[in-house]
Swiss-Prot record:
Keywords: Amino-acid biosynthesis, Aromatic amino acid biosynthesis, Lyase. This is 3-dehydroquinate dehydratase. Belongs to the type-II 3-dehydroquinase family. Substrate binds at residues 76, 82, 89, 103-104, 113. GO terms for biological process: amino acid biosynthetic process; aromatic amino acid family biosynthetic process; chorismate biosynthetic process; quinate catabolic process. InterPro entries: DHquinase_II (IPR001874), DHquinase_II_CS (IPR018509), DHquinase_II_sf (IPR036441). One of its GO terms (molecular function) is 3-dehydroquinate dehydratase activity. The keyword Amino-acid biosynthesis applies. Homododecamer. Catalyzes a trans-dehydration via an enolate intermediate. It holds the Pfam family DHquinase_II. Pathway: Metabolic intermediate biosynthesis; chorismate biosynthesis; chorismate from D-erythrose 4-phosphate and phosphoenolpyruvate: step 3/7. The record marks 19 as: Transition state stabilizer. The lineage of its organism: Bacteria, Pseudomonadati, Pseudomonadota, Betaproteobacteria, Burkholderiales.
Length: 144
């Protein structure tokens, strides 16, 4: 059972609530994180949420997870899902189980968004469920 969950949010997710709400919903990132923190507390696990627009910063945070007691990672790498071998390699290097989450259904989007550099390494993929997808991932992580 995971005791400490790290939730990573990639580029442009800091704009949630105002960025294309028809795709990503009307909740802000702060509201999503607050809901996840509340859920984690109810489940008896720790949760840290972190966001960056910068690929290198995400890689460094993934690497830091190796030393900070993180048992499980939930990641929405956003655009880096489709472009970043560096994020993939960092996740592979730390060998911490992770779930890939996307607010929108990647398979109803442009063809370039339908490829993920992360999915084959992930324990699972949740997409198209909006903020509920993060909650499903937290529930799973808390049990494994």
């Amino acid at each position: 059972m995971a005791q400490q969950i790290l939730v990573l949010h990639g580029p442009n997710l800091n704009l949630l609530g105002s960025r294309e709400p028809h795709l990503y919903g009307s909740l802000t990132l702060a509201q999503i994180n607050q809901g996840l923190e509340t859920l984690a507390a109810q489940l008896g696990v720790g949760l840290t949420a972190w966001q960056s627009n910068h690929e290198g910063a995400l890689v460094e945070r993934i690497q830091a997870a190796r030393q900070d007691g993180t048992d499980f990672i939930i990641i929405n790498a956003a655009a880096y899902t489709h472009t970043s071998v560096a994020v993939r390699d960092a996740l592979a290097a730390v060998a911490i189980p992770f779930i890939e989450v996307h607010l929108s259904n990647l398979y109803k989007r442009e063809p370039f968004r339908q490829h993920s550099y992360l999915s084959d390494l992930a324990v699972g993929l949740v997409c198209g469920l909006g903020a509920d997808g993060y909650e499903a991932a937290v529930r799973y992580a808390a049990r494994h």
